[in-house]
Curated annotation (Swiss-Prot):
It is an enzyme of class 1 (oxidoreductase). It catalyses: a primary alcohol + NAD(+) = an aldehyde + NADH + H(+); a secondary alcohol + NAD(+) = a ketone + NADH + H(+). It comes from the Eukaryota. Belongs to the short-chain dehydrogenases/reductases (SDR) family. This is Alcohol dehydrogenase 1. NAD(+) binds at residues 9-33. It comes from Ceratitis cosyra (Mango fruit fly). Keywords: NAD, Oxidoreductase. Its EC number is 1.1.1.1. SUPFAM superfamilies: NAD(P)-binding Rossmann-fold domains. Substrate binds at residue 137. InterPro entries: ADH_Ceratitis-type, NAD(P)-bd_dom_sf, Sc_DH/Rdtase_CS, SDR_fam.
Length: 257
């Protein structure tokens, strides 16, 4: 799918991976890019505008934990440009001692944003179809013992996204739902990580993981932009060590009819 002439909403678009993806996407001649973020970085937004002046860039201060804020922010997009073609859910934190905050941002906020956006994008309702990319993690595919709460939130994203990626929904809505899983990437998520583990005695295994090889956010962001353009409904992609790989999940159970 070409994103030229399309309207993109990027939640968490000023984070490291998100911002790099936005920098790539804006070179594709988008009609508009809506950057939703709790962070306020006017210089970063201005830099995006300068990359491609043909694309209109909007910044919205966004609280993903507020259903009212989600509803109003997406309604503002429709009021400005009529359609949402691409939604990227990229907000995320690592802070296992604060269970509610972690789940509210990483999972519940993502779910609420997706459910609010779908009727606006649905080709049989107010929209013209499109693609939703939910950012999970490799720790949404494999256990993450040092950060069990973070891991649980990302497993939740995985289950939610794969469920919405069922062909039945795509046939009705025209919205592809894709899951993107970054591997270890050099971002501030790792800052002060020793205070963010599940237990005090998680530190030993956590520090081993924290000192393993990472990739640059520029590489991961470029992979994310590529996944958006693929519009591969129901798919799962891993970006790890500079390589983008499509995942074929194991099937452990199927209903008997």
């Amino acid at each position: 799918m070409s994103v030229a002439g399309k309207n993109v909403v990027f939640v968490g678009g000023l984070g490291f991976i998100g911002y790099e993806a936005c920098k790539t996407l804006i070179t594709r001649d988008l009609a508009s890019l809506f950057v939703f973020d709790i962070l306020d970085k006017p210089e970063a937004v201005k830099a995006l505008e300068e990359i491609n002046p043909k694309t209109k860039v909007y910044y919205t201060k966004f609280d993903i934990t507020s259903k009212d804020n989600i509803k109003q922010s997406l309604a503002d997009v429709i009021a400005k440009v009529q359609y949402i073609d691409v939604l990227v859910n990229g907000a995320g934190i690592l802070n296992d001692p604060n269970v509610e905050w972690t789940m509210n941002i990483n999972l519940i906020g993502l779910i609420n944003t997706t459910l609010e956006a779908i009727p606006l994008m649905d080709k049989n309702k107010k929209g013209r179809g499109g693609v939703i990319v939910n950012i999970a993690s490799v720790l949404g595919l494999e256990p993450g013992p040092p950060a069990a709460i973070y891991c649980a939130s990302k497993f939740g994203v995985m289950g939610f996204s794969r469920s919405l990626g069922d062909p039945h929904y795509y046939e009705h809505t025209g919205i592809a739902v894709v899951t993107f899983c970054p591997g270890l990437t050099d971002t501030p998520l790792k800052n002060n990580v020793a205070t963010k583990y599940t237990f005090d005695y998680s530190k030993e295994i956590g520090e081993k993981l924290n000192h393993s090889k990472t990739q640059k956010p520029e590489v991961c962001g470029a992979h994310l932009a590529q996944v958006i353009e693929l519009r591969d409904n129901g798919a799962i992609y891993i970006s790890n060590q500079g390589t983008l790989t499509k995942v074929k999940p194991s099937v452990y159970w199927e209903p008997t009819y």
